[in-house]
Regions:
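Glycine-centered flexibility sites
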Residues: 85, 147-151, 188
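C-terminal helical "lid" subdomain and adjoining coupling/linker elements of P-loop NTPases
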Residues: 59-72
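Terminal substrate-recognition subdomain of acyl/acetyltransferases
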Residues: 1-56, 71, 76, 94-139, ...
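Conserved beta-hairpin
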Residues: 71-90
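Short coil/turn motifs at secondary-structure junctions
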Residues: 92-94, 144
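Conserved acetyl-CoA-binding loop-helix of GNAT-fold acetyltransferases
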Residues: 138-141, 146-162
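Intrinsic low-complexity, intrinsically disordered segments enriched in polar/basic residues
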Residues: 88-91, 108, 153
């Protein structure tokens, strides 16, 4: 049956980690434009392969969003032609003051804006939905290159880009564990909210942090 292999190839079901030919050296951080996925298909497969290896929720829907969803920002790190890190951010906020008040009052839930809406609705901070921000959707580092500060460097570069773009903050939502909380705090993020109940999908409390 040729259909199943075709679908697997089309949706990158069988993508694995990029091969780490050399592990000595310094990773170079670079931005990725959505158009690069078409001009450099190997970059797409390596980027998606890193995400799949690190995030069990990564799905074909994420692949679709990588290709054509608006408001996405991508960056990566590379050493000796091996992709060592991948970072995916989503634009949030920028709502009108009127809509932000509706979110704060619980009457409106516009699509997206996970952290911005949560801070407005649950933390009593409607201004969070007005401010312009970017949320870390996915971040992954190749296992052969971990504990070298690559994730921290990717985030630091995006902080600088956000400042240059006039954004107000970066954010992240994650299932709380002491290790993950420490990772985000070491990157400069400050914890701003923890849910009162554990998530069924992860068994962890949902935490939110901003930079």
């Amino acid at each position: 049956d040729t259909l199943e292999p075709f679908i697997s190839e089309l949706l990158l079901f069988d993508e694995h980690l990029p091969v780490a030919e050399q592990t000595d050296g310094t990773s170079e951080i670079f931005p990725i434009d959505a158009a690069d996925w078409l001009s450099e298909p190997a970059l797409l497969t390596d980027f998606y392969g890193l995400l799949t290896s690190a995030h069990y929720r990564t799905s074909p829907l994420d692949l679709r969003r990588l290709l054509d969803a608006p408001g996405m920002t991508f960056s990566a790190s590379r050493m000796h032609n091996t992709l060592t890190g991948a970072l995916w951010l989503v634009d949030e906020g920028g709502l009108s003051a009127e809509l932000a008040q509706e979110v704060w009052a619980g009457r409106r839930r516009p699509r997206g804006n996970l952290v911005a809406q949560s801070l407005a609705a649950h933390a009593g901070f409607p201004e969070a939905a007005v401010l312009r921000s970017r949320r870390v959707s996915r971040i992954a580092v190749h296992p052969a290159f971990r504990r070298r500060g690559i994730a921290r460097d990717l985030l630091a570069a995006q902080k600088q880009c956000a400042q240059q773009a006039g954004l107000d903050f970066l954010s992240v939502s994650f299932g709380y564990t002491s290790d993950l909380a420490s990772l985000w705090q070491q990157a400069g993020f400050r914890l701003v909210r923890i849910s009162t109940q554990k998530e069924a999908s992860s068994g962890c409390y949902a935490a939110m942090a901003i930079l």
